[in-house]
């Protein structure tokens, strides 16, 4: 008799690379370090990563009241460059700001590392000074959604890279901070159109879970390894259980998001119309309706995020993750 709780691993098919468990296994484990190195080299183009050391992904603020940060992947190369690699499945308020905030942790930590090294060499920290010479910090995000850009941004430009540069002449202040975004929602190439390694990575992020076998075009060593790791037949029961758990959380999140969006929009429109009609009597019907609808929709968006947070709490999602996903404050979430 088959145990209803028994995990049955599929005999064919591949895992979804943007699944939280799978993403961290492929890009954040010693088992697959060679795949991460290959990915970084393809993303950076002009840089060469020889080796990486994985770093802690949780960073606490200076005090209990300060915001903490939890990265998907954090690593340091043999040359000292630090990388944060994030998979972002859902759009959220101020994502670009959050990206900048995350890079502050490895930057600030470089002073502490310099002090530790001085202590190892001298046995004490007497006379220690730091010259502020930074190692590069690079933030890479793969997003499932389209990010906001200028109106003339090409709709199919899925790769963007940012540095700190002078406003008019474009001169780099320095090369110590870089942000790279890969937008899956802007990538629409078919298998026959894949040319660059970038194309191939983007295609697999979007389509690997739908493949029945490895296409011949993915002949490189790193892709052979990736297909081997991602094939369900090579999963243990425990690995598949963790994969399914992450799939369910993502499914629940999108269901919650859809429900809250519909509820929030409906409520926002109703409140906006009511408020607009009332203001319309005093200010002129057209202007009052326009303002009321705008304010009502904004209120609807806030209600939507609160409802999303409520449902995330119901499935025991960590509060820190809810804060990141919804943009709500810790206090707002704890009061639900």
Where would I find each of the regions flagged by the language model?
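Elongated, amphipathic alpha-helical interaction scaffolds
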Residues: 1-336
């Amino acid at each position: 008799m088959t145990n209803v709780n028994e995990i049955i691993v599929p005999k064919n098919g591949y895992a979804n690379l943007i699944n939280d468990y799978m993403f961290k296994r492929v890009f954040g484990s010693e088992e697959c370090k060679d795949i991460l190195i290959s990915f970084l080299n393809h993303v950076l183009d002009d840089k060469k990563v020889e080796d990486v050391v994985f770093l802690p992904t949780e960073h606490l603020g200076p005090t209990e009241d300060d915001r903490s940060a939890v990265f998907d992947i954090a690593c340091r190369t043999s040359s000292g460059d630090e990388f944060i690699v994030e998979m972002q499945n859902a759009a959220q308020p101020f994502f670009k700001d959050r990206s900048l905030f995350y890079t502050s942790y490895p930057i600030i930590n470089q002073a502490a590392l310099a002090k530790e090294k001085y202590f190892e060499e001298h046995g004490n920290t007497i006379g220690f000074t730091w010259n502020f010479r930074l190692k590069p910090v690079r933030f890479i995000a793969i997003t499932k959604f389209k990010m906001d850009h200028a109106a003339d941004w090409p709709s199919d430009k899925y790769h963007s890279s940012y540095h700190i540069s002078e406003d008019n002449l474009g001169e780099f202040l320095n090369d110590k901070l870089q942000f790279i975004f890969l937008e899956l929602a802007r990538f629409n190439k078919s298998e026959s159109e894949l040319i660059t390694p970038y194309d191939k990575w983007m295609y697999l992020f979007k389509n690997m879970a739908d493949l029945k076998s490895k296409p011949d075009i993915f002949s490189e060593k790193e892709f052979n390894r990736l297909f081997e790791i991602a094939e369900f037949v090579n999963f243990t029961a425990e690995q598949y259980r963790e994969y399914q758990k992450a799939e369910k959380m993502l499914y629940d999140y999108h269901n919650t998001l859809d429900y809250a969006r519909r509820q929030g929009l409906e409520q926002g429109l109703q409140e906006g119309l009511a408020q607009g009609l009332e203001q319309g009597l005093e200010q002129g019907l057209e202007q009052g309706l326009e303002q009321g609808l705008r304010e009502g929709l904004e209120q609807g968006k806030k209600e939507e995020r609160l409802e999303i947070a409520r449902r995330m709490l119901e499935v025991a999602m960590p509060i820190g993750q809810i804060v990141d996903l919804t943009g709500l404050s810790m206090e707002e979430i704890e009061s639900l």
